[in-house]
């Protein structure tokens, strides 16, 4: 009786068995990884589930990323994120008649470890978020103030725009892209803060131009500085490539100065940490450098922006400096 049952069971297995799915080739795995940067295991799983069809495997990976990303985000959401990086995007430095004023943004994207913080995918996401923030921002507030309180919920709901390929159609929102990153790196990832500087360009025929200076060091600290140039015919000066080159050097030096010193304000006679009261070492690189305020006045005179007893020239209106993980006022 037992022998007959075993024969029947064996026959049944043979009758209903099917050929195993063909093992994904190394070529297909490599192609899928190149297009998606997933792990070898995940690429094989996607191809096996899609009958070795690359297009179907891409769709499978996208669905899997959404599902696994949401699960991991929920699981890792409470873990601290002390590491990360600062990213700056400047879409328009301003001061030229063919661009629409100043448009820039700075963001802080956090993760759990420095290893992930230096990951190329993580850095690319941060750059894209900063680019998106600069692109979608509207001007609010006074002409001399940064838009410091950029609403993170608005930014997370916005389509993520590529910094490297701005014309590429978005494949998801900022929020969904952060969840995807959590799934890829296996760590909690959080967007901590963002600011945008958006200032309309004054009249091309006027005597005032706005500019933005920026600097990021080691992706851990970054700064933005809003400048005003006041002089008759400033638009003509800005049309000169040589003048713009010298101006950009000054702007970069100011942004570096703000990072390199304990800068708490722009210009205050009672505050020794104010920018204008500091030796401008990032410009001349000498220990006995003249003060920032003096350098700006001398530079303006040399460039013909400042006449005697004139209130023109170049001036710093506002600035922001960030460091990864620092405490800040909400």
Curated annotation (Swiss-Prot):
SUPFAM superfamilies: Elongation factor Ts (EF-Ts), dimerisation domain (SSF54713), UBA-like (SSF46934). Its main location: mitochondrion. Gene3D superfamilies: DNA helicase RuvA subunit, C-terminal domain, Elongation factor Ts, dimerisation domain. It is found in: Mitochondrion. It comes from the Eukaryota. One of its GO terms (cellular component) is mitochondrion. Pfam families: EF_TS (PF00889). One of its GO terms (molecular function) is translation elongation factor activity. Residues 1-16 form a transit peptide. GO terms for biological process: mitochondrial translational elongation. Keywords: Elongation factor, Mitochondrion, Protein biosynthesis, Transit peptide. HAMAP family: EF_Ts (MF_00050). Belongs to the EF-Ts family. Associates with the EF-Tu.GDP complex and induces the exchange of GDP to GTP. It remains bound to the aminoacyl-tRNA.EF-Tu.GTP complex up to the GTP hydrolysis stage on the ribosome. This is Elongation factor Ts, mitochondrial. It comes from Laccaria bicolor (strain S238N-H82 / ATCC MYA-4686). The gene is TSF1.
